[in-house]
Amino acid sequence: MNKKHLKTYKNVYSNPVKSDILWMDIEGLFRALGADISEGNGSRIRVKLNGERAVFHRPHPDKTTDKGAVKSVRRFLENARVKL
């Protein structure tokens, strides 16, 4: 994991919740953590990490992630027992 992934991880857990995290940075974090990512229908992606599964919707046309999605990513990482 590089500095960019660590920064994204910290941004996901920052309070108040950020709404300006680029989705591609979150996907990069998933990959750096060893997640399996597969394409779903439309702009959905399926993510599996440490036995935990989730489906996320890529934001469009904006590339930033809204607060609700950031909270979902946070819950997913917690359920997957990711700690840095």
Residue ranges of model-derived segments:
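Basic nucleic-acid-binding interfaces
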Residues: M1-L84
